[in-house]
Amino acid sequence: HSRPVSFKDSCGGSENQFRLLLKYLPDESFKDVNLILNNASHDLIEKDKINVLWMHHFVNQKEAENLGSKDFVDKLDWIVFNSNWNFEKHVYQFKVPETKSIVIRNAIEKINFEEKNKNKISLIYHTTPWRGLVHLLKVFKNLNLENVELNVCSSTIIYGKKFDDIVGKKYKSIFDECKNTKNVNYYGYLENKKIIDLLKKMHIFAHPSIWPETSCISAIESMAAGCEVVSTNLGALYETCSPFGTFVNFDRNFDNLEKRYSKALAYSIKNFWSDENQNKLKLQRETINSTYSW
């Protein structure tokens, strides 16, 4: 049977979900199904098949625009959203029919727990730079804490060479700043398997997100690996990380956001090894690994 074609040069969250779906579902599941990832394009419709659009994008992306066209939506049999939040936003923005919509949350492969280093606190930021890296770096520098390091796994090459050629230059200065900042380890792009190995050693996923995440696989993986998540409540982050995450209110005034985030991060660092927090993280690991599973 024909299978949907994966985007070979992109290793973003959506594409990795796609690859895992192909891994876990047998070939016969795709019989008569045309599965379209993240692109509401007339050209991708196959009229003799069941057309399923798997939507990880937010409503502000150009690939979502055709969901406002009745002509296009009529050609779809199903629209699968990766969170209730994303579904609600599409209903609000495009009036997509609820009868054709379904929410299936993202999934990860089980992450085995390893005891974490008690002599230092390791923070990690392992998502694209435009989601809040500038603000995190500023907060981290200002906190200037002993025995705390920040590990940055962020790049534009994750979405392929073409994307990197167009967008990469814009983020060169922030990546250079990471390389030249005390107690910051800059890894650039790491394949997902290496990220998971690193997460097992990390204590806190520091994610002052200014981007409306529609799910946030990096947060799911972090929680499964026993990391505290300190993030904003923007987009679907609250849905994905509740009740375990530590949230600050998103604020368009970035000075306010940084102040608030700095307090929350400092508190989480200070209290990481408290009995109460360790009990919470144990429950978090078990819950996330079982609820976000394939």
Question: Which ranges hold each PLM region?
Answer:
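Short beta-strand->alpha-helix junction loop in the catalytic core
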Residues: 86, 103-113, 156-159
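A short, active-site helix/loop in glycosyltransferases that binds the activated sugar's phosphate group
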Residues: 77-100
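A charged, aromatic-enriched C-terminal amphipathic alpha-helix characteristic of glycosyltransferases
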Residues: 12-16, 252, 256, 273-294
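Acidic donor-binding loop of glycosyltransferase active sites
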Residues: 200-214, 227
